[in-house]
Each structure stands twice: as C-alpha cells, then as structure tokens.
Curated annotation (Swiss-Prot):
Most abundant in placenta and skeletal muscle. It is also detected in the heart, lung, liver and kidney. IL15-S21AA is preferentially expressed in tissues such as testis and thymus. Disulfide bonds join 83-133, 90-136. Induction: By interferon-gamma. This is Interleukin-15. Keywords: Cytokine, Cytoplasm, Disulfide bond, Glycoprotein, Nucleus, Secreted, Signal. The gene is IL15. One of its GO terms (molecular function) is cytokine receptor binding. It comes from Homo sapiens. The keyword Kinase does not apply. Residues 30-48 form a propeptide. GO terms for cellular component: cytoplasm; cytosol; endosome; extracellular region; extracellular space; Golgi apparatus; nuclear speck; nucleoplasm.
C-alpha cells in the first residue's frame, strides 16, 4: 500500500520506529547504540573517499611509468585554501586528458573511479563559488608527474579540513 500524503508517511515511520524501539532496544545499552547510530548517520564520511582518491592517484602514477605520455597539464601548484574547490575541479578536468592520452583501459577505469569519488566528496562544497581564483587555463602547464604530485597535495588539504 502506497501512502501519498507525506504527513501520513511520517506517522507510519514513527509507528514502525516505536515498535522497533519497544521490541529490540529495551535495554539502556540498546538505546545508546541506537542514538549513536543516528548521530553517526549524519556525520560526513568524505575522508575515506579522499584516501581512496590518493590511492587511485598512486595507481595512475604506477600505470603511466611504463608509458611515454608527453602531455602538459594545467596544474595549480600553490593552492590557496579559499580556492581549493575551484582547483580540484580543474584537476579533475585535466585528469581526463591523462585518460584520453594514455588510451589504456586500466588508466581510464581508474580515472573514472577517481572522478566519481572526488565528485561525491565535493558534493557538499561543489556549488560553492570561490572568488579571486584562477581559471584552469590560467594555471601553469606542468608534466604529468608534477601534476599528480600537486593533485595529491590538494587532496591532502581536503583530508586535513574534513
């Protein structure tokens, strides 16, 4: 049965929650676990994503060692903390260049995974407008190795502030 009125839906959820609490969480410890679980559901879980982004960057670095990719990429080497979201978006755009230049399926898959992880982590600040930041095309062009090192540095900035 589908309930089309939102206030009725919330009442039914409250009834199920009450039944659940009465039947399984009668002990004080059970109630504490339930409350802590509710709090933890609201906490941001982006740090784990950023750690996985760094892992994928290391994997890309290892994969391109055997290839000769002579690309220069727009790289922000001195990111100001107030411009880190803008810089990250530039890094993600330039990362697609590596994927295209390599022509390697493994690199392509790793890049796609990394972009998904980073975008999920950025979702809370993704719509932030940062003023006074450089556009991607205004950044200095550097080789892939320097690009990846700078990318790791900016990801660490996100980890340290989460």
């Amino acid at each position: 049965m589908r309930i089309s009125k939102p206030h009725l839906r919330s009442i039914s959820i409250q009834c199920y929650l009450c039944l659940l609490l009465n039947s399984h969480f009668l002990t004080e410890a059970g109630i504490h676990v339930f409350i802590l679980g509710c709090f933890s559901a609201g906490l941001p879980k982006t740090e784990a994503n950023w750690v996985n982004v760094i892992s994928d960057l290391k994997k890309i670095e290892d994969l391109i060692q055997s290839m000769h990719i002579d690309a220069t990429l727009y790289t922000e080497s001195d990111v100001h903390p107030s411009c880190k979201v803008t810089a990250m978006k530039c890094f993600l755009l330039e990362l697609q260049v590596i994927s295209l230049e390599s022509g390697d399926a493994s690199i392509h898959d790793t890049v796609e995974n990394l972009i998904i992880l980073a975008n999920n982590s950025l979702s809370s600040n993704g719509n932030v407008t940062e003023s006074g930041c450089k556009e991607c095309e205004e950044l200095e062009e550097k080789n892939i190795k320097e690009f990846l090192q700078s990318f790791v540095h900016i990801v660490q900035m996100f980890i340290n502030t989460s």
